[in-house]
Amino acid sequence: MFTVLLVDDDPDVLELTRIFLERDPDLIIDSCSSAKEALQKLNHKIYNVIVSDYVMPEINGIQLLKTLKFQGIETPFIIFTGHGNDQLAKEVLNSGATFYLEKSENPRFQFAKLRKMIHDIALKQRREEHYREQNICVVIPAHNEEKLIGTTLDSIPDYIFRIYVVDDASTDRTPEIIREFAQKDARIFPIRHETNQGVGASIASGYQKALNEGMDIAVVMAGDNQMDPAYLPDFLDPIINKHVDYTVGNRLQNFEYRKGMPQIRVIGNALLTLLTKIASGYWQLMDPQNGYTAITRRALERINPSTIYPRYGYCNDILVKLNTYGFRAKNINHTSRYNIGESSGIRYRSYIFRLSKLLLKDFLWRLKEKYIITNFHPLVFFYLFGVISIMLSVILGLYSLFLKIAFDDSILTRATLSILLLFMGLHFVFFAMFFDMEQERNNGR
């Protein structure tokens, strides 16, 4: 059951609101006619939500809300008023109210909206209680994030059991700020790298600590406050409900995000997404460079944090390992916060080249581990024959071109054979990719 305290000095409105809300069997309604009476009740009883009028004698709705905040009472609070305007709405929400609702001439509509707000709060509270039953941690890699690390730590929800902040040899005030927050919040556990090891190594350190302390789920969020904690339930629910083992963010559904990206980054992101699909075998995933992720303890133990690539590219490396060992992954659409003082340490030209080499190495390792050693699949031959055919096609084509230029020799026969080899090679490769896609679909069932 969900308990609601109504506060309104108008007895008719109070009674009408009570009657309407009591039609919902999940709600238990209590009421009082003044803020003073509400404060007395709150000294003896805990409610799940408070619905208060704004204009009341002696103490108005906002003053009641501020008094409760001062007393440390964080009960969700809805201002329900007939004296509304945009300025008041802004003041109410800035004061910490959960929702703001104006009374209208259509009682059925306004009470239905009020009930929906109450149900949204109830759902959120039940969700958070469910999360508290799990040992959920957040790993935050931080390198020279003095501007935003404090804001990031402040935003972590209460249902997160542990926060591992990994300082990767920062040279600014980042370590000092982390220590200050750790003194105020017992959930925060600082980890310090004396030498810069890379963002992948920082996350691996956090993952290892999470395993050592028995965490059930480990979430990764950047230290620059770009990753909105409001999306955490979307990342956690598929894992808690045992639908997947790994969730990874997808910003590419957001048009504003794509619109604001430099052209070189758009092209680079598209190329790396394609290469990661091929290398990892997760053909349905988008935005593999996204660092906003959540992973189960079981998956984390299997991939072994110490084997994670230490620099940028770690997220692609993790995907390859997860697919190789048969874990399910899912994209979570979300928006990110930009232009808040963050800065990127990625040099995209060198990053794309370096990551392409890593993906080739990981791809060959996955084929060996997954389709030769663990469970043999003929797609390995398709890839092999495809690559050999394409290479022979290129060599034969170049040789024919050389003969034509050097000796004016006829190239028709050789060119035809080269083209046939090319098409045959592409067919082999595409069939191999198709079989790989089918493996992913079967793994997701």
Predicted regions and their residues:
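A conserved acidic beta->alpha catalytic loop
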Residues: D167-E176
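Receiver (REC) domain active-site loop signature in two-component systems and cognate sites
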Residues: M56
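Two-component/phosphorelay signaling modules centered on CheY-like receiver
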Residues: P11-D30, S155-Y159
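Helix N-cap/capping motif at the beta->alpha junctions
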Residues: S31-Q40, G61, T171
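Alpha4 helix (beta4-alpha4-beta5 surface) of REC/receiver domains from two-component response regulators
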Residues: Q63, G84-L101
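Acceptor/aglycone-binding surface of glycosyltransferases and processive sugar-polymer synthases
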Residues: F189, H193-N212, I217, P229-Y312, ...
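Hydrophobic helical membrane-anchoring modules
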Residues: E133, T307-R445
